């Protein structure tokens, strides 16, 4: 039934609008609450046929732990996968992970959970539910998670090591994580948030009594704090009946503990919390201005969405100003962004804040410049032009959401339900959302926005958090000095913001259109159009996303056409162009001109190709093609923008090697490629060898002759509307075919790109680390034909290995948070395959774990893959194939690789998966070991 929103339009246009006017909630959700307090959300969604997502959310997190339980909320989340009443994993009944993977639901990708300060959420996603037994079992898992975890002594002890390794993974190489742990007691002094991060205390994790975990589970996992969410290709009434029958019998505990949401105190004087870490490369500052949150009971009204709308306008406009400042020849800060939302980790306090990277040689200047823009906005507000652009952008986003309202994947609707249950966010339809935005655009005045900016951006209730390098050469100003930087900047005098009037057209003078000289039907249902300048256009019309079109325009060439001596310039060829803007417009002006458009184009250059890639809405296809024309034929040269980017990069790279992970990655690349000049990292000293003239020349030569380019468009494209646009913006690109090519490469010679060295080696080195770790990478390379079958066999091999390592290295040994296995198959130079195995662990364990890694590979080469594991992988691949073929990105990938590499990854893919044998995978493992090309690189903490 078509809903009539005229009542809302009348109310919004009326001067007597009441902010408390209730919102109509999205009726497509079937919602309810059982007698025991459990909430449920159910929604049918046919976008993914035969697929559904199952979630259970808890209004429970690490903030509820008692001191002796620090880390147990997160620990309990892990234990949910290690045995329940109906999924024991003891041989009598399957465990949750094995059962899920038996139906194509992959652990990690589809089966997962997270714990935060105030919530814990579990998911079983992308479940094939055409069989009712599968749907019933997925609900049964949610039921068991809610109150039927086994929590056996043995499984608890096994998981301690896994948690410890997760702690190591999260902290190692992540200085901001460590510093955040240390500043929270200062920021939240006297509140429960002083020590509340979910990872907890490793001393407790390693030693807590079993009873403490069971007590936490019994106290907090209960139906009045839980919600079941099911979205997908299901019958909502049937699922509702099942939920009532299955979950209704769960008892609501008597004398249940109160779920307290702990307050955050306000402060008269600024709180300054600073911390230093030897692995932190740059100084980061976050200036918070705390505000009260909107009570949950006041969020289901028009006024709440209106306030959010105004707030988002303010943040958008302020960030645009900060980006302008960043484009200066010598930017006063490395980066700066404005935000509004939750204050750090607390649900009970909101904030506006500025985040900015400081120049270490001029910390005060960075503070001054960032705060100047927030103060300018607070005092003088925003211009009518700024406001109009921000409102246009809001409307464009709402229009796209409306256009694609029937194209949403399950997760979109799951997130709506999660936000409603966990944060009381209103659930409204895209139709109502669009109508609200239209009315807000008409009724919200500049004066209202500027008054809101004064309330949001304050000089009261402030908190300054600074993360800085711990280096002798960097002198961090004392806390009172940093506080004074803020106060002085907030008291300084500023002029109002002003901007020049924008031009009307991206391309003021259009060239004479070209023509389409031929049309035919191509592979995969594409329409192939030959243009008069020699460019070939492939169009794949789809209706998967009603308001999306993807584009790529590419040609052969790339950096392999240039000598090794140009290698320092390669990383800047594309970025120098985007930093400069395009045509007659600098980057800031271009951003403003595109504010009401959903269209963008980005240049890139790889070893063998140069490319322009973009996305647009259906209405803004013309704009995307205009940008394509400009980036190809009229890139903009801007020395000021280039020098500013190099200057920022130089500051970013000052302490580059402070992070051990950076040093490790540098060593990996050097070892693998023998210090090849094309594989050198960009360091501070490298910047001295970068030439803007040469960067510009490489770009112009790369995009000089469109006759050698192909274009691919995928999405909701109307061919008849497209033809004149192609004639105007693509057929007019410079081309040797019509003698308009703008340049010729200095050399047609193709320089060899580096391969991984042919070696069988083991490397070990040490590096000082703040979190003791061993990082291990093992690379196998071998010659392998580049075919769909070899790609599939290698994919299955890496997935089977991933499962084996999860079982043996993570679960049995508790030796790592996870072993990552990846592969690559290349056809250039010579057809080569690579398999990479990597993990992080305790330095005391790496010598025990590495042999296990090798044994698993040898086992598959000797005996073949585990048949159960291989069957699970094939089911997962077939399921994801069904999901992929209704996605524009999939078709872009498939068609591009057919055109560029001559490889058909689509035709008969399902049959290829079904026909792949254990022998095929075993042979791949044999080839891998038989090549004797293995490089192992381990970095240990000193």
What are these regions (language model features)?
Residues 20-42, 235-323, 327-329, 388-392, ...:
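Proteolytic maturation boundary segments
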Residues 160-212, 216-223, 229-231, 236-243, ...:
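Hydrophobic, small-residue-rich alpha-helical packing segments that form membrane-like cores
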Residues 1-22:
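Bacterial Sec-dependent N-terminal signal peptides
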Residues 41-43, 48-65, 71-73, 91-144, ...:
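M16 family metallopeptidases and their MPP-like homologs
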Residues 72-80, 314, 573:
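Active-site His/Glu-centered metal-binding helix of metallohydrolases
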Residues 148-156, 444-448, 452, 636-642, ...:
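Peptidyl-prolyl cis-trans isomerase
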Residues 204-243, 681, 689-729:
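Internal metal/ion-chelating core segments
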Residues 79-91:
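Metal-associated gating/positioning segment near the N- to mid-region
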């Amino acid at each position: 039934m078509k809903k009539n929103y005229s009542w809302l339009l009348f109310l919004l246009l009326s001067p007597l609008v009441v902010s408390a006017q209730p919102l109509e909630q999205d009726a497509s959700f079937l919602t309810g609450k059982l007698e025991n307090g459990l909430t449920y959300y159910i929604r049918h969604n046919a976008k993914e046929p035969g697929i559904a997502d199952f979630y259970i959310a808890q209004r429970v997190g690490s903030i509820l732990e008692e001191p002796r339980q620090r880390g147990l909320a997160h620990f309990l989340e892990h234990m949910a996968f290690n045995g329940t009443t109906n999924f024991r994993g003891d041989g009598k009944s399957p465990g949750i992970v094995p059962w899920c993977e038996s139906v194509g639901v992959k652990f990690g990708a589809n089966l997962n959970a997270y714990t935060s300060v105030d919530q814990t959420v579990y998911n079983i996603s992308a479940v094939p539910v055409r069989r009712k037994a599968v749907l019933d079992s997925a609900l049964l898992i949610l039921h068991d998670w809610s109150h039927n975890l086994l929590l056996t002594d043995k499984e608890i002890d096994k998981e301690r090591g896994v948690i410890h390794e997760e702690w190591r993974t999260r902290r190692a190489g992540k200085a901001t994580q460590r510093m955040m742990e240390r500043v929270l007691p200062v920021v939240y002094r006297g509140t429960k948030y002083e020590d509340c991060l979910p990872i907890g205390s490793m001393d407790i994790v390693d030693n807590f009594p079993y009873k403490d975990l069971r007590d936490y589970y019994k106290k907090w996992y209960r139906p009045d704090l839980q919600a079941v969410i099911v979205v997908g290709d299901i019958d909502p009434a049937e699922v509702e009946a099942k939920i009532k029958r299955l979950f209704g019998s769960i008892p609501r505990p008597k004398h249940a503990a109160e779920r307290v949401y702990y307050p955050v105190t306000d402060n008269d004087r600024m709180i300054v919390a600073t911390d230093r870490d030897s692995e932190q490369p740059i100084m980061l500052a976050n200036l918070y201005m705390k505000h009260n949150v909107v009570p949950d009971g006041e969020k289901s009204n028009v006024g709440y969405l209106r306030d959010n709308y105004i707030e988002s306008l303010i943040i958008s406009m302020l960030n645009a100003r900060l980006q302008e400042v960043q484009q200066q020849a010598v930017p006063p800060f490395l980066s700066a962004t404005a935000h509004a939302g939750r204050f750090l980790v607390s649900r009970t306090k909101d904030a506006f804040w500025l985040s900015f990277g400081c120049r270490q040689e001029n910390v005060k200047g960075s503070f001054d410049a960032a705060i100047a823009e927030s103060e300018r906005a607070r005092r003088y507000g925003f211009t009518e032009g700024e406001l109009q652009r921000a409102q246009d952008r809001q409307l464009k986003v709402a229009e796209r959401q409306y256009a694609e309202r029937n194209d949403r994947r399950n997760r979109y609707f799951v997130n709506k339900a999660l936000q409603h249950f966990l944060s009381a966010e209103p659930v409204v339809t895209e139709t109502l959302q669009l109508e609200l935005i239209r009315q807000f655009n008409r009724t919200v005045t500049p004066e209202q926005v500027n008054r809101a900016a004064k309330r949001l951006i304050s000089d009261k209730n402030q908190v300054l958090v600074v993360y800085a390098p711990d280096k002798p050469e960097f002198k961090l100003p004392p806390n009172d000095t940093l506080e004074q930087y803020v106060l002085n900047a907030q008291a300084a005098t500023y002029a109002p913001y002003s901007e020049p009037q924008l031009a009307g057209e991206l391309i003021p003078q259009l060239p004479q259109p070209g023509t389409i000289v031929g049309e035919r039907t191509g592979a995969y249902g594409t329409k192939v159009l030959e243009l008069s300048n020699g460019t070939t256009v492939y169009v794949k019309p789809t209706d998967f996303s009603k308001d999306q079109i993807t584009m790529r325009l590419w040609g052969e060439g790339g950096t392999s056409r240039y000598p090794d001596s140009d290698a320092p310039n390669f990383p800047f060829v594309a970025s120098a162009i985007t930093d400069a803007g395009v045509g007659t417009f600098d980057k800031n002006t271009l951003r403003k001109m595109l504010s009401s458009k959903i269209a963008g184009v980005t240049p890139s250059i790889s070893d063998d190709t140069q490319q322009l890639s973009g996305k647009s809405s259906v209405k803004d296809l013309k704009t995307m093609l205009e940008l394509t024309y400009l980036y190809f034929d009229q890139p903009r040269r801007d020395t000021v923008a280039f020098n500013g980017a190099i200057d920022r990069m130089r500051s970013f790279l000052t302490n580059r090697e402070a992070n051990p992970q950076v040093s490790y990655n540098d060593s990996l690349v050097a070892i693998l490629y023998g210090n090849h000049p094309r594989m050198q990292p960009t360091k501070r000293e490298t910047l001295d060898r970068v030439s803007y003239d040469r960067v510009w020349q490489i770009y112009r030569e790369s995009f000089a002759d469109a006759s050698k380019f192909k274009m691919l468009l995928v999405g909701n494209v109307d061919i008849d509307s497209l033809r004149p646009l192609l004639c105007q913006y693509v057929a007019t690109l410079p081309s040797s075919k019509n003698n308009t090519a703008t340049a010729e490469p200095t050399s047609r010679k193709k320089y060899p790109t580096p391969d991984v060295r042919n070696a069988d080696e083991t490397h070990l080195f040490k590096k000082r680390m703040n979190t003791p770790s061993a990082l291990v990478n093992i690379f196998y390379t071998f010659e392998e034909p580049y075919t769909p079958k070899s790609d599939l066999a290698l994919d299955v091999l890496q997935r089977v290995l991933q499962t084996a390592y999860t079982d043996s290295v993570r679960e049995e040994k508790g030796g790592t948070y996870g072993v990552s296995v990846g592969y690559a198959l290349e056809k250039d130079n010579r057809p080569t395959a690579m398999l990479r195995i990597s993990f992080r662990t305790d330095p005391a364990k790496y010598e025990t774990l590495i042999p296990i890694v090798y044994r698993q590979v040898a086992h598959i080469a000797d005996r073949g893959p585990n048949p159960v594991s291989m069957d699970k992988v094939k089911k997962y691949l077939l399921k994801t194939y069904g999901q992929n073929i209704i996605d524009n990105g999939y078709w872009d990938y498939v068609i591009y690789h057919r055109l560029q590499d001559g490889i058909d990854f689509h035709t008969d893919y399902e049959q290829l998966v079904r026909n792949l044998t254990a022998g095929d995978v075993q042979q791949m493992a044999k080839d891998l070991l038989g090549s004797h090309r293995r490089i192992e690189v381990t970095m240990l903490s000193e």
